[in-house]
């Protein structure tokens, strides 16, 4: 009989079962092998009522609970013998689960599911393996929430517990089409959250081993409704990032569907799987709704009094109020746009970081305006200072007191161009189109970039698009007995005469230096440099109070004393490398600085001329580092002039190539909008080409270099022979800029 049974039921032999009397087995079914058969008893969508945590109104009241139970069996036993004794009686399971659920209170879905699994695996139900899916369709106002767990009688945990959020229906700005950048559209989000189902020896295992779904949902809803992503991939990834980083989710599946994406499809969407390790500290990017991480752009304007002083004072006050300025644009002068009968404006934009929320930021900016004396008499009329929030990250706000993005930004060149100075690839949060595209659509750009001189309350402007500015002449006044060009023929007695000649000949700036910079020259003591230049600057300031004086020095202490004596500009041939205090000093003094490219020092610069395969690319890299360092030190971008360093750390061929390709260097994105100074005057390479050994005789080589500089887009020329070079620049401006 037993032999017959074994023959009829070879399944027993396969699984190593031994049949005894009745329904008793000496050897139990191996659970892992049982699961491979996928034989299951189901109870689908059993709706009961119970208190499971809080309902959608945050109350501990009865709410519907939908249960689906799957219990592992060996269907071959009960099927072949047609005997329920070999299976699980789902009626018994139903009764026991019903009794448990409707007569108990549960902390959360995990507590409920865990206790149901213990009932199914208990002596009455005789289960060995169970999958419990528990849902609370009324658990949240916007979505259905639920949980799936798998438990075994032997206590082994096979897979992670899975919390799920289904059919979270929200409205947000999403897409790349123009209409999608204006109108919010419906999206459906499904989430599956994985949690390691560790069998903790603790009564409150269900409390320790769960997620705060309510808190997670609240943040996701806020995040999605405030977001303005162009792709659902970006939105899905941001949801995964927030979940894993902010809520400690171990692993997540995010599904995002756009219900209106395709005319003849129910939806189009994306599904991603991410774990917490995907967002490690090395590649973690904060959520876009993290206030401290959002890029905030503030526009600044003034058209009364000392305009640049008001703008600089506003920036200083912002830093005091916790509004950290990260980057500034160039400064532009613009004609009044709305109320025409008023003075021209200075305009700029700064990128800031702040923990203030938009409404708080607006309050602080308005307070700064009040502190600086702004009184509004006429709408869009004259004002000493005007501060506006242009963008606040991706936020879109439309309240009675604040509209973000600024409603008139797209019609204002004096805001669009400064934005591009800071970030060339910036896009409008609502339309998704680039700021550059809007700027190009404006036909009449009635703005011009300016270099302001705070203590003179004046500025010089530069060419921009259709507006053409003349090339400015910086006259060299070296008060050095070891000067490489003239042996130091200038004395204090002749300073006034020489400066008067320079001014009459067309010079705009007088560059005074007390330290020779020729290769091989020695560095004089600090006291000696101060003795040479400070009295001369004071004398010139007294005699010619309106002349712009530049101090040619690489020492911060000399620069500070020179500015206090009357200098308006610092010209540092080392680009801030020789004195680590230089950039901070210039930032504090609030004056422009000319940053020159060079390598090494006066003794070894001629040996440091290896620029690899492309001198322009290498100079760009090295000069950009100096530029970034200056800006990080607090020097506004509008107070920076660049100099490629002709004759410094460059061979004859490299100097010629630099002149020939100067426009290529100037056009680099990292130097966008910055003015350039070139100093080819009487340099050794000009004399080598023309055969003039004596510096005084190198005028013809200098002439050609000046013409080349202007043709390449140079803004300021630093020269010795002012009269001749001014004439040359006038003719060059007529040819290259059509100024005549």
Swiss-Prot record:
Pathway: Cofactor biosynthesis; tetrahydrofolate biosynthesis; 2-amino-4-hydroxy-6-hydroxymethyl-7,8-dihydropteridine diphosphate from 7,8-dihydroneopterin triphosphate: step 3/4; Cofactor biosynthesis; tetrahydrofolate biosynthesis; 2-amino-4-hydroxy-6-hydroxymethyl-7,8-dihydropteridine diphosphate from 7,8-dihydroneopterin triphosphate: step 4/4; Cofactor biosynthesis; tetrahydrofolate biosynthesis; 7,8-dihydrofolate from 2-amino-4-hydroxy-6-hydroxymethyl-7,8-dihydropteridine diphosphate and 4-aminobenzoate: step 1/2
Classification via CDD domains: DHNA_DHNTPE (cd00534), DHPS (cd00739), HPPK (cd00483)
Variation of activity with pH: Optimum pH is 8.
Region (DHNA 1): 39-160
GO CC entries: mitochondrial envelope
Record: residues binding Mg(2+): 478
A Gene Ontology BP annotation from the UniProt entry: tetrahydrofolate biosynthetic process
Cofactor(s) it depends on: Mg(2+)
Effect after changing residue 53 to A: Reduces DHNA activity 11-fold
Effect of residue 63 to N: Reduces DHNA activity 16-fold
Alphabetized SUPFAM superfamilies for the sequence: 6-hydroxymethyl-7,8-dihydropterin pyrophosphokinase, HPPK, Dihydropteroate synthetase-like, Tetrahydrobiopterin biosynthesis enzymes-like
Molecular function terms, GO-annotated: 2-amino-4-hydroxy-6-hydroxymethyldihydropteridine diphosphokinase activity; ATP binding; dihydroneopterin aldolase activity; dihydropteroate synthase activity; kinase activity; metal ion binding
Region (HPPK): 291-449
Catalytic activity: 7,8-dihydroneopterin = 6-hydroxymethyl-7,8-dihydropterin + glycolaldehyde; 6-hydroxymethyl-7,8-dihydropterin + ATP = (7,8-dihydropterin-6-yl)methyl diphosphate + AMP + H(+); (7,8-dihydropterin-6-yl)methyl diphosphate + 4-aminobenzoate = 7,8-dihydropteroate + diphosphate
Coiled coil: none
Enzyme Commission number(s) of this protein: 4.1.2.25, 2.7.6.3, 2.5.1.15
Annotated region (DHNA 2), positions in chain: 161-280
Binding-site residues for (7,8-dihydropterin-6-yl)methyl diphosphate, renumbered to this chain: 517, 552, 571, 643, 683, 718-720
Function, in words: Catalyzes three sequential steps of tetrahydrofolate biosynthesis.
Protein name (database record): Folic acid synthesis protein fol1
